[in-house]
């Protein structure tokens, strides 16, 4: 026989609500600390015992509550933060539903002590399992103290899902860290089992980061500040080498509220995509400010997820703000001490270690032509000759480079200011910056220059192409042929010129000019693979970036490549004029720095 529909008792509905709001001790801490911040406090003390299962106590010096308000606060959906439905779209507080206190009280032994500013005494309320047992006057400082004991004592099924004391305590510490980063003007203290985990005094955001994440992280952060299209993005972003294996150090806030939002995270990762290797995540503390009516925070019980009215605009502004800082590579510092002249500046021939004069001349001849000749026609599956080293379009020599010596000196960029010592293994350029030794990966540097050049050309309409003297036929799969037909426009903008020869056979008539002299058919197939992934989880912009990265990588020297003085100067001039110049498009570093102290330590001189 079917059961009749009935109204659930209030004690049961509170437990159901608690299941949505109170997932673990950290959830309780979040709700109570947010209430303290909404109360306008200047200091918050968070104390836990047994990972929060035995005790959670939150003390603040905020505005406090009267006896009547304190009792009303334990009723469901009782709040001072909203009054009409319009208020839901103009929220200026962290809490607004009026569910937290009754939900927490329903699954714990709960004590609320509060004293309103200007009152001569406070009020203390004790509740057990959601039922108020005692209300009395008390003496206390202005503010509020909430104590939660024996969490989930009346819901044993929930206790089974609790993790170890250490794990639950770690979640609480992480939660308090996120909240403390959002309000550097508020003092925070976090105590676990009588031990102070951290104490953060009021100060600047950088001070707060140093106190919570460490001075090493703080020293690697650089400011972000951009306001456009109704969105303002401020905060701090770390240089690429200070990265993590997980997204745990992405601290993002919308109108002061900590969020984990896929749109925001994607925008940040897009800005870093050519700085970090796959599987690495940056350290950022970002604050996004938009009109309250442009964001809906009433999406999830924990309020960690939000919905933007114009998410595309928000995404692009965040990405642009982070890229603006990364583009300037502010972490490159010039030594303040004068650059000492190298002991012996090698002549151009001396950069080539173990290479005879005849080989030097051959290399110079190869470098005379800025664009290599296109490889002669060969069938796709014909026997291949022994592989030759990949060649880059040579950097112009000292007599014909794009930026002459005057321009290099006039630019005054970081790379051009370095004193070149020589080459190591025909792959790394050794330089001196004051007393520091700077080692530059010439392949990574040239790859970044080529990549940024390709991006500029693509943004202007089309990557510079080059027609083949002997067009080449290529057999593609049916799927690859479909991709060519569907994305012919994108392929054309990327510098490829393909003509349908019938069936799945295509004629390659032109290629990106930077690919001349390389295995461009292999790259063509890789490009088609990238374009095949569109529509599932990738946009055309994502695919194009990856394709241009591949083109840049294939177009530059991979093996040992001796450089003359003029070529090094030209490369450095290009690097000074190139955005994001400290990392190659794959995220690998272009340069490493060793201080004199580090070198002396290697030799046990200090």
Swiss-Prot record:
> Does the record bear GTP-binding in its keywords?
no
Q: Known Pfam families for this protein?
A: DNA_mis_repair, HATPase_c_3, MutL_C
Q: Which InterPro entries match?
A: DNA_mismatch_repair_CS, DNA_mismatch_repair_MutL, DNA_mismatch_S5_2-like, HATPase_C_sf, MutL/Mlh/PMS, MutL/Mlh/Pms-like, MutL_C, MutL_C_dimsub
Record GO terms (molecular function)? ATP binding; ATP hydrolysis activity; ATP-dependent DNA damage sensor activity; mismatched DNA binding
Superkingdom is Bacteria
Gene3D superfamilies under this entry? Answer: 3.30.230.10, Histidine kinase-like ATPase, C-terminal domain (3.30.565.10), MutL, C-terminal domain, dimerisation subdomain (3.30.1540.20), MutL, C-terminal domain, regulatory subdomain (3.30.1370.100)
In the record, the note on similarity to other proteins reads:
Belongs to the DNA mismatch repair MutL/HexB family.
Q: What is this protein called?
A: DNA mismatch repair protein MutL
Give the species this sequence originates from: Geobacter sulfurreducens (strain ATCC 51573 / DSM 12127 / PCA)
């Amino acid at each position: 026989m079917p059961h009749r529909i009935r109204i659930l008792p209030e004690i049961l509905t509170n437990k159901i609500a608690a299941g949505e709001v109170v997932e673990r001790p950290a959830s309780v801490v979040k709700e109570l600390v947010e209430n303290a911040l909404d109360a306008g406090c200047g200091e918050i003390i968070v104390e836990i015992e047994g990972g929060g299962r035995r005790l959670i106590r939150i003390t603040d010096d905020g505005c406090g509550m009267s006896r009547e308000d304190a009792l009303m606060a334990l009723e469901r959906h009782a709040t001072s933060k909203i009054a009409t439905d319009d208020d839901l779209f103009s929220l200026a507080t962290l809490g607004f539903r009026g569910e937290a206190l009754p939900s927490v009280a329903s699954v714990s032994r709960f004590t609320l002590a509060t004293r309103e500013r200007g009152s001569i005494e406070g009020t203390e309320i004790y509740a057990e399992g959601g039922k108020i047992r005692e209300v009395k006057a008390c003496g206390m400082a202005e503010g509020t103290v909430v104590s939660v004991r024996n969490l989930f004592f009346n819901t044993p099924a929930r206790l089974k899902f609790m993790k170890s004391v250490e794990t639950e305590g770690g979640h609480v510490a992480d939660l308090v860290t996120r909240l403390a980063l959002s309000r550097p003007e508020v003092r925070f203290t976090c105590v676990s089992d009588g031990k102070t985990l951290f104490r953060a005094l009021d100060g600047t955001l950088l001070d707060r980061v140093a106190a919570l994440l460490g001075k090493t992280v703080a020293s690697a952060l650089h400011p972000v500040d951009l306001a456009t299209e109704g969105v303002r993005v401020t905060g701090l972003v770390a240089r690429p080498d200070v990265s993590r294996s997980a997204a745990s150090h992405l601290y993002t806030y919308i109108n002061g509220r900590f969020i984990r939002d896929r749109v925001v995270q994607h925008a940040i990762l897009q800005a870093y995509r050519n700085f970090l290797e796959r599987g690495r995540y940056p350290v950022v503390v970002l604050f996004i400010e938009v009109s309250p009516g442009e964001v809906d925070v009433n999406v999830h019980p924990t309020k960690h997820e939000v919905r933007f009215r114009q998410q595309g605009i928000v995404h692009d502004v965040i990405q642009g703000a982070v890229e603006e800082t990364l583009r300037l590579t502010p972490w490159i510092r010039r030594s303040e001490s004068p650059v000492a002249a190298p002991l012996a500046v090698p002549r151009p021939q001396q950069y080539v270690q173990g290479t005879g004069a005849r080989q030097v001349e051959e290399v110079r001849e190869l470098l005379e032509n800025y664009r290599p000749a296109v490889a002669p026609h060969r069938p796709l599956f014909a026997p291949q000759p022994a592989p030759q080293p990949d060649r880059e379009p040579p950097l112009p020599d000292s007599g014909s480079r794009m930026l002459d010596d005057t321009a290099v000196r006039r630019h005054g960029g970081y790379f051009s200011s370095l004193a070149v010592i020589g080459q190591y293994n025909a792959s790394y350029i050794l330089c001196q910056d004051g007393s520091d030794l700077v080692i530059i990966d010439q392949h990574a540097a040239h790859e970044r220059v080529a990549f940024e050049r390709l991006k500029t050309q693509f943004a202007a309409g089309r990557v510079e192409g080059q027609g083949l003297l002997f067009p080449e036929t290529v057999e593609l799969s049916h799927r690859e042929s479909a991709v060519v037909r569907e994305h012919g426009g994108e392929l054309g903008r990327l510098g490829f010129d393909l003509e349908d020869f019938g069936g799945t056979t295509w004629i390659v008539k032109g290629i990106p000019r930077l690919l001349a002299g390389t295995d461009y058919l292999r790259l063509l197939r890789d490009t088609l693979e990238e374009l095949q992934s569109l529509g599932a989880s990738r946009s055309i912009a994502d695919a194009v970036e990856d394709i241009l990265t591949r083109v840049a990588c294939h177009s530059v020297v991979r093996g040992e490549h001796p450089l003359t003085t003029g070529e090094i100067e030209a490369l450095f001039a290009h690097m000074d004029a190139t955005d994001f110049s400290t990392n190659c498009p794959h995220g690998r570093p272009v340069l490493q720095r060793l201080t004199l102290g580090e070198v002396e330590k290697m030799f046990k001189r200090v």
